[in-house]
């Protein structure tokens, strides 16, 4: 675990350097059609990163942010009106069944969808309209370190794409 903690700065730099073009592309799309609300879906450690993202996004953008309750979709089969909403699924592996289902249902209901994952070939990366990779490499420790801080960095980049006054140079 100590090695993975020490690898975080390089993983964050790699994520920032390789994902910035994708973030700029999303920023242009959002400038034309900004969301009225944001919904974050995640489980486990990723859910903790989503909670951080909620505070950051609401404070930095003024857009209301909610944390998804996947059982609304998985257990109760409810359909939500998702037009003009941005749904963001966060998953280290990209294979969290209920997180992916939330994104799939939101997409069916007209939401713009984003996936944040460490796995380029994951179901989440393929399902989301915009997939952002936390380029942390393989995480051997049970306690997610590199992927967790990478997900937090992606929350900053999402805030930037939504028009927050964040200077990318400050993230380097």
Regions found by a protein language model. Name each.
Residues 22, 31-170:
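Glycine-rich phosphate-binding loops that contact phosphosugars or nucleotide phosphates
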Residues 1-36:
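An N-terminal, well-structured beta->alpha segment
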């Amino acid at each position: 675990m100590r090695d993975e903690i020490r690898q975080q700065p390089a993983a964050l730099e790699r994520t920032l350097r390789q994902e910035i073009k994708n973030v700029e592309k999303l920023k242009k799309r959002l400038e034309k059609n900004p969301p009225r609300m944001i919904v974050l879906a995640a489980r486990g450690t990723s859910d903790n990163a989503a909670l951080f993202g909620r505070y950051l996004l609401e404070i930095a953008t003024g857009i209301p942010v909610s944390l998804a309750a996947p059982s609304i979709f998985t257990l109760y089969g409810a359909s939500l009106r998702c037009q003009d909403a941005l749904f963001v699924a966060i998953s280290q592996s990209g294979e969290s069944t209920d997180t992916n289902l939330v994104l799939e249902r939101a997409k069916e209901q007209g939401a713009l969808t984003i996936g944040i994952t460490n796995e380029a070939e994951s179901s989440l990366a393929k399902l989301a309209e915009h997939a952002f990779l936390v380029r942390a490499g393989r995480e051997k420790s049970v306690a997610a370190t590199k992927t967790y801080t990478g997900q937090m960095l992606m929350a900053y980049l999402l805030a930037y794409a939504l028009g927050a006054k964040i200077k990318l140079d400050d993230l380097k």
